[in-house]
Amino acid sequence: MLNLNELKSGFHYFVMGWHFITQKGLRRFVIMPIVLNTILLCGLFWLFISQISSAIDWMMNFIPDWLSFLSVILLTLSILTILLLFYFTFTTFSGFIAAPFNGLLAEKVEKMLTGENINDDGLVDIMRDVPRMLAREWQKLRYSLPKIIALFLLSFIPLVGQTIVPVLTFLFTCWMMAIQYCDYPFDNHKVSFDIMKNALGNQRTQSLTFGGLVTCCTFVPVINLLIMPVAVCGATLMWVENYRNDLGFNMNRSFSSQTGLDVRSENTGIVK
């Protein structure tokens, strides 16, 4: 069921992400994710251009002759599916490569919001955390990969693969974008992946709204170069205002998808 308050708050956190990347104390931590994002997007664009024609021909071969009158619509949906599959590839690589930098950016944003240090700032401490961050990215990949494979297999089914699959793929992409970027502040506090996933699922409309805006902006030229640090900043604000008090200092507590959070933001007035 659509929750209008969560819809509003998801939009709010995305907009606030743009505000934070302009803050003086955060700019130097924003630069590296932007550079990495630019390199990865250029590589993705080259791969997409070189493979899109053959990929479209392959998908259209599964459309029966009696549906040829819908070829334009089905072609559009097929292209959307291919775009989203390429997008999964991009987010997977970017997650592994940029994880240490995004984790550090999330730390700095949280410190700006709360005035409290999370971890030591020494280079040795940061390097010590890198294996844990990469293991977390691998955990996200293990969570998403079976679903991606299932969507890929469904795309072989005539009509279903060109109509329902694009919608499911888009919704799953929105969900994964919320998980991808919210995970950085959660992981900084060593909150487990399952607890994080269930917490986000408890406010699913907010998560899907935030993830949907991130997904859409990834396909907009120029804006997509900035979207990674924007999403990290917005997700960190979401963590501080929704989950930090409940999870950040009570890691041993079991958090199920049925648990309700009633967190009110003194800064924004948004009520969940």
Curated annotation (Swiss-Prot):
Residue ranges of coiled coil: none
Membrane topology: Multi-pass membrane protein
Any one GO cellular component localisation term in the record: plasma membrane
Membrane-spanning intervals of the chain: 29-49, 66-86, 148-168, 219-239
Pfam families xrefs: EI24
GO biological process: cysteine biosynthetic process; sulfate assimilation
Subcellular location: Cell inner membrane
Domain of life of the source: Bacteria
Keyword Membrane: yes
Disulfide bond sites: none
InterPro entries in the cross-refs: CysZ_sulfate_transptr (IPR050480), Sulfate_CysZ (IPR022985)
One annotated GO molecular function: high-affinity sulfate:proton symporter activity
Keywords, alphabetical: Amino-acid biosynthesis, Cell inner membrane, Cell membrane, Cysteine biosynthesis, Membrane, Sulfate transport, Transmembrane, Transmembrane helix, Transport
Family classification: Belongs to the CysZ family.
Its job: High affinity, high specificity proton-dependent sulfate transporter, which mediates sulfate uptake. Provides the sulfur source for the cysteine synthesis pathway.
UniProt cross-references to HAMAP family, sorted A to Z: CysZ
Name of the featured protein: Sulfate transporter CysZ
Organism of this sequence: Haemophilus influenzae (strain PittGG)
